[in-house]
Amino acid sequence: MNYLKILIPVTTLSLIFVIDYYNKYYKPNTSFENESIFLYVVEDDSIAFRDSISKYLKSEKTFYKVAKRLEYLQNKKTGRFKIAKHIGKNDIVNSLKFNNTPVNVTFNNQERVENLAGRVSKHIYEDSTSLLSAFRDKKFLEENNLNEQNVLSIFIPNSYNIYWNSTPEDFRDRMLAE
């Protein structure tokens, strides 16, 4: 009899704790119709991040509590992240931490390196000016026996999976390796 007086409250408290824990971390917190969405995050732009993610969340306040507890907000990374429908706050944070998703960059024959830079900049975070500077970098050109007239030859028309947050140098070096 005394055993039941202890067991019932302990079980009730445990159940309350488990339900609260589930609701806090794992209860679905997305509010969009598609099966998934892509979220573009810039590391040092907290206002844009808040604006872009808030429209996809049922509860922004609880998401930020979980994100803070999991140390995401202090360690936010730039990238393109896929968020699936019907996932909880914990899974959203894990997607934002670990699931940087590449974009498909396709280009055909370009007559000028400026055109190529403009085309690629539509798919990645960096602008065409930054890409053009990387393509025309004197040290890079010298090290690879290239010049401004023939640098376009390293860009083979095709489709490539590139991370949205790739630097111009990363992209250029990837094209050289291809």
Locations of the language-model features?
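Conserved catalytic or metal-liganding residues and their short signature motifs at active sites
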Residues: 2-178
